[in-house]
């Protein structure tokens, strides 16, 4: 019986050490390392059905897809910045037209480098209920990168960003907090990227 109790005690102690080690892991840093080592990813930030941003990369091709609609507006705006073949394309979907900027590459590492800058800042940990479920979060100060709303008049030093993770450490939500206001984005991150995302529709005209 004593031997069994000792074994149980050892197992419990090992589990506590592992749990403590996992609790101290910087989860956003793991997201960064995963993105940096991947050849493709699709990162979607959604405030609601009418306002979202999709950033995708596959090899040397990148898109930034933006959907916006103001509350008083009747239509949704959809624009895409596409970088491929050493050119940048600005696609205006409502007009079915696009502009070509030859040999003018937009920074294709904006997402990865943005997260890299954030993980080097001080952060705190917590747990909070979001839309009915509880999530662990890491809160960082000094970045408005993940705000879809207008950020022109915002003092970044006053901004806090919470990254919420599910039980499998997948990024689930991002909340940007500024004073009494906040913006919550639902996050989807996958490595499955369809090549069709990087194609301009055949019925669009070059301007």
Say what each PLM segment does:
Residues 10, 14, 66-68, 114-117, ...:
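Glycine-rich loops and low-complexity Gly/Arg-rich segments
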Residues 6, 36, 83, 91-93, ...:
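Compositionally biased amphipathic helical and low-complexity segments enriched in hydrophobic
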Residues 1-61, 191-207:
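N-terminal leader/targeting segments and the immediate start of mature chains
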């Amino acid at each position: 019986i004593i031997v069994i109790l000792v074994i149980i005690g050892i197992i419990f102690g090992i589990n506590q050490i592992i749990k403590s080690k996992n609790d101290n892991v910087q989860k956003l840093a793991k997201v960064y390392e995963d993105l940096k080592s991947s050849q493709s990813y699709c990162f979607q930030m959604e405030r609601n059905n009418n306002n979202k941003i999709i950033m995708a990369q596959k090899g040397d091709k990148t898109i930034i897809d933006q959907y916006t609609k103001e509350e008083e507006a009747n239509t949704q705006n959809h624009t895409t910045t596409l970088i491929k073949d050493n050119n940048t394309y600005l696609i205006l979907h409502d007009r079915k037209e696009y502009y070509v900027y030859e040999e003018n590459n937009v920074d294709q590492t904006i997402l990865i480098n943005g997260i890299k800058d954030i993980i080097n800042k001080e952060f705190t940990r917590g747990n909070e209920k979001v839309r009915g479920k509880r999530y662990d979060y890491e809160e960082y100060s000094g970045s408005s990168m993940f705000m879809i709303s207008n950020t022109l008049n915002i003092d970044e030093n006053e901004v806090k960003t919470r990254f919420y993770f599910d039980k499998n450490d997948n990024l689930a939500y991002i909340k940007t907090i500024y004073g009494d206001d906040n913006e919550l984005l639902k996050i989807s991150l996958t490595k499955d990227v369809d090549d069709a995302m990087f194609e301009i529709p055949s019925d669009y005209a070059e301007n």
